[in-house]
Amino acid sequence: MGRKWANIVAKKTAKDGATSKVYAKFGVEIYVAAKQGEPDPELNTTLKFVIDRAKQAQVPKHVIDKAIDKAKGNTDETFVEGRYEGFGPNGSMIIVDTLTSNVNRTAANVRTAYGKNGGNMGASGSVSYLFDKKGVIVFAGDDADSVFEQLLEADVDVDDVEAEEGTITVYTAPTDLHKGIQALRDNGVEEFQVTELEMIPQSEVVLEGDDLETFEKLIDALESDDDVQKVYHNVADF
């Protein structure tokens, strides 16, 4: 499973890197985090978390600095979080999280992306109840039992720890993600491949052939929207 999360980050970075979409999306997220609190990551836990995630996605330092500098200025641009749930082919389910300065534009764009690519946007709550929100931490290692004990000793609410092919994946309660990261740092982990809040499907579906091709086009259309920050789904091995 750890390889899955690392592959998702690598795939997204490779796909978006050429057009700098991933940079722009992190730029907005960093700006919002800095604007809502102190523009200093040492004094703003949320900002530090976003910056760490940006670095994992290979976002350049100048992009991070520019977003923080923008937040320090007099701009009054505001962004609103949104969530759009829907369905793809053959039992696939999708959750789209957005961050936008124009809610009407974003809602229309997401609905169009669903409708023109074999999907169907549903009502709020139509899909999310079949997903669980968890903290996901991925780093190099192979001793899951030791990591589990370290997290318990640090009073971290940990759901599971998996080891696979030299990679450790930790699942925490969403409220304990930051606490888990700090506990691992305190125990010598210096570099993380993934530190994310994720929506984990309670069960997965397998798509093949035309269904898989349609689903891939649908996900690409959703992720290509500038206002879309995260896309979650229940399709296995994708």
UniProtKB/Swiss-Prot annotation:
Name where it mostly resides.
cytoplasm
> Does the keyword DNA-binding feature in the UniProt annotation?
yes
Give one Pfam family. TACO1_YebC_N
| Record key words, sorted | Cytoplasm, DNA-binding, Transcription, Transcription regulation
For this entry, the protein name equals Probable transcriptional regulatory protein SpyM51586
Gene Ontology biological process terms from the UniProt entry: regulation of DNA-templated transcription
Q: Which family does it belong to?
A: Belongs to the TACO1 family. YeeN subfamily.
The cellular location(s) given in this protein's UniProt record come to:
Cytoplasm
InterPro entries listed in its UniProt record: Integrase-like_N, TACO1_YebC-like_2nd/3rd_dom, TACO1_YebC_N, Transcrip_reg_TACO1-like, Transcrip_reg_TACO1-like_dom3, Transcrip_reg_TACO1_YeeN, YebC-like
Molecular functions per Gene Ontology = DNA binding
Record carries keyword Nucleus: no
Q: Which HAMAP family match?
A: Transcrip_reg_TACO1 (MF_00693), Transcrip_reg_TACO1_YeeN (MF_00918)
Task: List the GO terms this entry assigns under cellular component, sorted alphabetically.
Answer: cytosol
